[in-house]
């Protein structure tokens, strides 16, 4: 790869230090695990270049960009608990499926240029005529800025609190 080519380059002057981050899509993972090991101790680091696979580029093509490029990634997990039962008995139920659907809709509305929130997993159980007691949601939140990340997390908490108050779930 690139490291091998640079190491073999006779005109290259300097020290090249290659880092490979483990579990970059996991939490905790990626750079936080690497940096916890203090890999730069004893080195005078003048530049760090990050690389990530970009499926929109042709194989063998490198893309460069100054500044922020890859966002932070938070894994989100939610549980909506209600009182399930037979679908014909809706007035007696506290439907977590309906509440979860509204919650997902409100979460997705938080998306904008500096934030990407996705729900990639919804698990409920039940049957065609049975409303489950609980719905599980999982997704990711990606932001470029720590302050923006904190703001979105607070908005998520506010939405959850408001829905809890409105639905009794």
Residue positions per predicted region:
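DPxDG-like acidic metal-binding loop motif
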Residues: 1-3
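Histidine/acidic-residue-rich, glycine-tolerant segments that coordinate divalent metal ions
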Residues: 6-121, 126-130
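Metal-dependent amide/peptide-bond hydrolase catalytic core
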Residues: 97-169
